[in-house]
Amino acid sequence: LDEVKEFFFRFFFFFYAVLAVTGNISWEETVRLTEKWFAPIPRRNVPVRQLPQEVVQTAERRQTVERNVPLDALFMAYHMCSREDADYYAFDILSDILSNGRSSRLTRRLVQEQKLFSSLDAYISGTRDAGLLHISGKPSAGVSLEQAEAAVRKELEELKSGFVGEQELEKVKNKFESTQIFGNINYLNVATNLAWFELTGQAEDIDREVDNYRSVTAEQLHRVAQQTFRDENGIVLYYQKENL
């Protein structure tokens, strides 16, 4: 418990907090309750944190580990930009093209048609700092990790060598827009999203999010794919079950 308290008082400051309030409540009542619960908390000095930047990767990182797990798993990752970079939206769309929904490329081709994977997913970290585009999956019975990796790489090479079609790109954009709209129906999601956008910039940015995704072009996706899906920018982990 002492370690928890020490961590809390070192890194958590209400000076940094963003309070988002939604629902049937007046401004006056919001102010009253905020002052009631937060005003008594004393302000403390905020230490300046100097976080080291990760060294640029210049060669592929690869590792194989064996553990007492029921199934083999393949993990691949590629360095990407921060959420504040203009290319962030292209990365998010690339991950959706790869594995968001039954008609996405990895799901349709490698899971449903070729049956090389029992499950396969692609997603981005979405952090304020530079992050990773992740690809993780569990190969089907009888499929080696080498075969699984080769199949994924073939799909990535297709993104690098060709342009995403207009219909496929529009489908992904429409899906994102509908998710945004329905995701902001309930009060909790609205408050969470407003707080996040205020923390990372300004709350009004939430109204520009759909436009930011809509502005991504096939040419931008092609450029980002070529820059990203390179061996020297990638990390590969074979997570194998032990032969007991």
For each feature predicted by the language model, list its residue ranges.
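A general, composition-driven signal for non-globular sequence regions
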Residues: V55-V56, D96, T107-R108, Q167, ...
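Charge-rich, well-structured scaffold segments of protease-associated domains
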Residues: L1-V46, T64, S82, A90, ...
